[in-house]
Structure formats: C-alpha cells, structure tokens
C-alpha cells in the first residue's frame, strides 16, 4: 500500500536559462532552474503576494531563484509546512518533454517512488560508480504522451549532467554546466526528508511556469556531433 510522505517538490524555470553542454562526442541543450523541496502536503505554491483569500493561511519563505531572492507563498492542504530545501534543477531542452505549469484545475502532479532499473543500468553501463541504484520518483497523471499515445515516462532522478536526461528532471548543485555527484546527494537528501526511501511512497510536484521546450535551444543543432 502506498504511503504519503508529506513532501512537495516545487519547480521553477523562470527566467528561462539554457546552455550547450558537451557530453562525449555530442552537445546537448540543458535547461536550468530551481527546485524547492517542502516538508508538507501543499495545495498551492506561487510567487505572489498573499491576496485576501490567502492572507491568513499558509507560509511565506524567501528562496533564491535565477532572478534573485523571491517570496514563495505556500498553502498546505492539511497539516503544517516545515523546512524548505533548495536545489538547482536540470532538464533536457531542444524539443524534449517538459512538464506544463500546474493550474487551479490541476494544482499538482502526484509522485510515486520506485526503483527504476533502466536508470540504474544506464549508470552502471556508463561507468558511474557512485549512484543510488535507480531510486527515483515517477511523475503521475501528467498530459505528456508518447507517439503511440501512452503517457510518457517522466522521472525525478539523479543526473551528473544533461546527457543522462531525456524528459526527466534532476536536482543538484550546478558546477559550471554539470551537477557531478551533487545530484546523487540531492536525491538522498530528499529521501531523508521523507523518512528514508521505500518503493511506492507518495509525494507531490508543483510546476510554477512553462518550460517552452521547443524554443529552448542553445546548441546550433540538438545533439550535434563535435
């Protein structure tokens, strides 16, 4: 039976920032943002002043974005709102899948923990010695479809650099154009916030802004050989 972890991930890509990253013999488009991990089941998160309907509930926190310090207003669905941890976020750009921003009609995307063997095996095949064995979150109930009409597989998992991503999201600490081992450590910090990793734990993801996936291209051509 799935258990609720009382954790919400909040993703912002504003202002849009891309870079062209050399990975082996190719270059790949990277989209950088910020990921805030909140202890609490959030009903909403937004960058604005608390209006009359939100003035007496929730919590405001100062977070660091690519636009500098901003006030993030958080409202819990139930219970209290606890600590907030901040990470950089990394996604693949240049036409790859990006989750759309959440709306009042769809306030968040459900997440479920899993051990993904494709992620694990790709790290082992790529010679990455230190990884967390494919432990990740799967994004549920999102609108992105594959060409055959099946819901696309979007994960939140570790990634040393953008070459390990297609439509997925990785947290970490940006070091030039890479995360390095900070991505594995970031995922482990998130798992610690939810009381340790176990499969089928539930969490939430709130996406604050649109990714503009088709417009995000820093390389002359996606996956250009160099």
Set out the residue ranges of the language-model regions:
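Cell wall/extracellular polymer interaction/catalysis modules
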Residues: 1-181, 185-203, 210-226
């Amino acid at each position: 039976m799935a258990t609720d972890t009382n954790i919400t991930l909040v993703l912002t890509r504003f202002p849009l920032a891309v870079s062209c990253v050399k990975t082996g013999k190719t270059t790949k488009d990277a989209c950088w943002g910020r990921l805030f991990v909140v202890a609490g089941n959030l009903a909403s998160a937004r960058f604005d002043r608390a209006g009359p309907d939100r003035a007496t509930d929730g919590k405001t926190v100062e977070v660091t974005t690519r636009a500098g310090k901003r006030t993030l207003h958080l409202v819990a669905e139930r219970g209290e709102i606890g600590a907030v941890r901040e990470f950089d976020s990394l996604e693949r750009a240049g036409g790859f899948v990006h989750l759309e921003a959440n709306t009042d009609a769809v306030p968040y995307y459900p997440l479920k923990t899993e051990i993904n063997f494709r992620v694990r095996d790709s790290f082992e095949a790529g010679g990455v010695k230190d990884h967390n064995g494919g432990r990740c979150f799967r994004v549920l109930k999102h609108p992105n479809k594959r060409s055959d009409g099946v819901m696309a597989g979007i994960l939140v998992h570790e990634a040393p650099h953008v070459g390990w991503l297609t439509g997925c999201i990785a947290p970490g600490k940006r070091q030039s154009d890479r995360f390095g081992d900070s991505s594995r450590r970031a995922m482990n910090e998130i798992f610690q916030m939810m009381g340790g990793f176990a499969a089928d734990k539930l969490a939430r993801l709130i996406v604050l802004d649109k990714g503009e996936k088709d417009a995000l291209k820093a390389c002359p051509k996606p996956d250009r050989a160099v």
